[in-house]
């Protein structure tokens, strides 16, 4: 209890200290900061965009929790579509946003046995390697090509969310040899029903091959990959929904780290973009959790689908030089 109180009190203080430190450093090096933001594509006073991003990401954090989607999948298309930043910098910040959420959630999920380390490690090895390749491809391609591909991907994600029907505890009658050899099985306790569920996987090889594509897309677009991890783990491989969600969140802390290093190494992560975005999403998530009990998930879900369709279409048109 004391630990939870300390965490709740300490996180806002730490976030405020980070923001103050970033703004103080920026004020001392104003010409360099203005030049850096200019390279990112921003115009106007240097302090305006971090404040706008902070407020925007606060709203985004609330919506992400209520809709049950990762912040990264909303952050990249919306910020690239409605802010004057270059896409490379948006993708770098998007990976940092997804990574921050995953690192915060990972230890708790492992402790509650909602994330399976045996399931995550083989998947993470494939996805993180491919995320590095995806990041290198994304930075090498012309911006308009990446915008077109991003728009098409966001439209696909919106359709996937609309059509997907996850199964709480899929029935796996015949686990395959690869899943058994890799130890992809376990037991988790469902607190809501008070029952223990034993689970195992099937169609393991096709599932692992899917993570090659997921890893490349995560690195190329800076989206994180929770939107794709859960359907593959749950619907294709037969992992219970709660374990799939928990393992997916833990996976992001490994997959996004490898891709984020590429963007950091190329100078595509600007603290004045990344830190306000992370802090805004963090505070928004706290508010979203409190509103979750009162919200109507169906309405929020359709609202997010609508936002993604609009953002995907805007990115597609921007890449084609129309919007």
Where are these regions (language model features)?
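Hydrophobic transmembrane alpha-helices of secondary-active solute transporters
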Residues: 60-64, 214-219, 255, 259, ...
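Interfacial segments of multi-pass membrane proteins
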Residues: 75-89, 211, 219, 228-243
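Juxtamembrane transmembrane-helix boundary motif
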Residues: 1-60, 81, 87, 111-215, ...
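Generic transmembrane alpha-helix signature in multi-pass membrane proteins
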Residues: 76-77, 103-114, 198, 217-219, ...
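Short helix-coil transition sites and intra-membrane helix breaks within transmembrane domains
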Residues: 63-73, 218-226
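Conserved kink/hinge residues within transmembrane alpha-helices of Major Facilitator Superfamily
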Residues: 68, 105, 131, 259, ...
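Central cavity-lining transmembrane alpha-helices of secondary-active solute carriers
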Residues: 100-106, 279-284
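Small-residue hotspots at the loop-to-helix junctions and early N-terminal turns
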Residues: 91, 245-249
